[in-house]
């Protein structure tokens, strides 16, 4: 796909949503490719700019990139906030930067949550498909990672600002104990 194709696909999706009666969208994104469509759209958008950075050494760079993307939306008067991608893809230092920013901006927070058995295994024992993907497929050093022995949600809630609205996506493996 080239940029022109991507723009056409984004515009087409926007039109289909409007025709289907959708008037408000929370869009999880990690780029500014949708800005032009959002500026012309009749739909109200809030863009959740995802930040990724599993290794602590990447926190500053990952956060700066997310702020850069968010600024492109802000400069065009489009609503957006910087958010963590998922519990397994964000280091503690990156969570802290995102939380400080969310508190300062009084922004919405959104995060993919408990979407696979592999995510649960990663947090409880440090094994599973997420662990394999991070170390073998992505080639990221996981030596700093220490499993918490708890669910991913319980493990990261302490890094999310308590007073900011929180939207969690998926929740396929969320248990009653996580909610309690």
PLM region descriptions:
Residues 1-8, 54-59, 81, 86:
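Active-site mouth loops of central-metabolism enzymes
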Residues 1-31:
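Metal-associated gating/positioning segment near the N- to mid-region
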Residues 11, 33-41, 63-180:
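Histidine/acidic residue-rich metal-binding segments in metalloenzymes
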Residues 16-23, 43-44, 54-57, 72-75:
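Alpha-helix capping at helix-to-loop junctions
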Residues 29-30, 49, 113:
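Glycine-rich, histidine-containing beta strand-loop boundary motifs that form or position
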Residues 44-56, 108-110, 134:
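Acidic, His- and aromatic-enriched active-site or binding-groove loops in soluble protein domains
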């Amino acid at each position: 796909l080239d940029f022109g194709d991507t723009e056409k696909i984004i515009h087409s999706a926007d039109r289909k949503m409007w025709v289907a009666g959708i008037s408000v969208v929370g869009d999880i994104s990690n780029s500014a490719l949708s800005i032009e469509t959002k500026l012309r759209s009749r739909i109200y958008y809030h863009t959740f700019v995802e930040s990724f950075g599993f290794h602590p050494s990447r926190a500053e760079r990952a956060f700066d990139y997310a702020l850069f993307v968010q600024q492109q939306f802000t400069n065009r008067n489009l609503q957006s906030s910087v958010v963590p991608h998922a519990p397994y893809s964000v280091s503690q230092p990156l969570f802290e930067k995102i939380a400080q920013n969310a508190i300062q901006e009084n922004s919405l927070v959104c995060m993919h949550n408990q979407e696979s058995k592999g995510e649960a295994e990663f947090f409880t024992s440090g094994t599973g498909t997420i662990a394999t993907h991070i170390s073998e497929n992505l080639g990221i050093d996981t030596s700093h990672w220490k499993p918490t022995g708890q669910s991913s949600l319980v493990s990261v809630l302490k890094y999310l600002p308590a007073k900011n609205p929180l939207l969690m996506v998926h929740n396929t493996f969320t248990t009653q104990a996580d909610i309690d």
